[in-house]
């Protein structure tokens, strides 16, 4: 893979930034693609652009605002609260998001001569999102290959690891401080450690605390 090119689905968050650093080590050339689906915080797109610029990565932003029209949810509508009732999908789930993002990323990848697509979806911490499952990604990979007659390979470096191991991976990639300080995971639009209260921040902090404890234990 060292001589090949990849496109990273990139939001500027912890997971996709870790995947970006992973891709930079795996491939000769890397591009990033971010999707504007009228998410609550436009800062997400700005954050992604700033990270890509700092790392010298070509960055494309695609307009996916149609998603907001089709699938109202807590990530795009300020009048919808962020909730997760037992047995139901979280209000932050955007119907069809990863299906569309990966499909459009594949179209872009083919246009720029890349066959590798990298995404930060994770089944371990998938929070009830059906489009973060390994079975979905593998199925879509086959569908994309058939639909465009092109040998795409979708990579999911985080699929089987939890948030603590995601922090560990960023550390192994030499990107721990960068990811901690410059990424945007918070649903309330606060870069770095975030608000500490939304589900995304709580998951991120729990993973960070666990990893830091493990790292200190290993040094002892």
From Swiss-Prot:
Reaction catalyzed: 7-carboxy-7-deazaguanine + NH4(+) + ATP = 7-cyano-7-deazaguanine + ADP + phosphate + H2O + H(+)
Keywords annotated in UniProt: ATP-binding, Ligase, Metal-binding, Nucleotide-binding, Queuosine biosynthesis, Zinc
CDD domains, alphabetized: QueC-like (cd01995)
Entry's Gene Ontology BP terms: queuosine biosynthetic process
Keyword Ribosomal protein: no
Pfam families membership: QueC (PF06508)
Protein residues bound to Zn(2+): 186, 195, 198, 201
Enzyme class: ligase
Cofactor(s) listed: Zn(2+)
Function text: Catalyzes the ATP-dependent conversion of 7-carboxy-7-deazaguanine (CDG) to 7-cyano-7-deazaguanine (preQ(0)).
Subunit structure: Homodimer.
PANTHER family in alphabetical order: 7-CYANO-7-DEAZAGUANINE SYNTHASE (PTHR42914:SF1)
NCBIfam families (alphabetical): 7-cyano-7-deazaguanine synthase QueC
Family affiliation: Belongs to the QueC family.
The protein's name in its UniProt record: 7-cyano-7-deazaguanine synthase
Organism of origin: Bacillus cytotoxicus (strain DSM 22905 / CIP 110041 / 391-98 / NVH 391-98)
Organism classification: Bacteria, Bacillati, Bacillota, Bacilli, Bacillales
Gene that encodes it: queC
């Amino acid at each position: 893979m060292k001589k090949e090119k990849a496109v990273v689905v990139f939001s500027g968050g912890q997971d996709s930034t870790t995947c970006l650093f992973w891709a930079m080590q795996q491939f000769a050339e890397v591009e990033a693609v971010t999707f504007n689906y009228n998410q609550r915080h436009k800062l997400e797109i700005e954050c992604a652009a700033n990270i890509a610029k700092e790392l010298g990565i070509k960055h494309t932003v695609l307009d996916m605002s149609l998603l907001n029209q089709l699938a109202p949810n807590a990530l795009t509508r300020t009048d919808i609260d962020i909730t997760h009732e037992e047995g139901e999908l979280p209000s932050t789930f955007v119907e069809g998001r990863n299906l569309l993002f990966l499909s459009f990323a594949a179209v872009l990848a083919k246009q720029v001569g890349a066959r590798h697509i990298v995404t930060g979806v994770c089944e371990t911490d998938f929070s009830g999102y059906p489009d973060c499952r390994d079975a979905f990604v593998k199925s879509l990979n086959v569908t994309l290959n058939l639909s465009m007659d092109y040998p795409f390979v979708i990579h999911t470096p985080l699929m089987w690891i939890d948030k603590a191991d995601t922090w560990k991976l960023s550390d192994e990639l030499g990107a721990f401080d960068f990811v901690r300080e410059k990424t945007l995971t918070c649903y309330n639009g606060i870069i770095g450690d975030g608000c500490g209260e939304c589900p995304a921040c709580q998951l991120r902090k729990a993973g960070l605390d666990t990893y830091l404890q493990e790292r200190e234990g290993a040094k002892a």
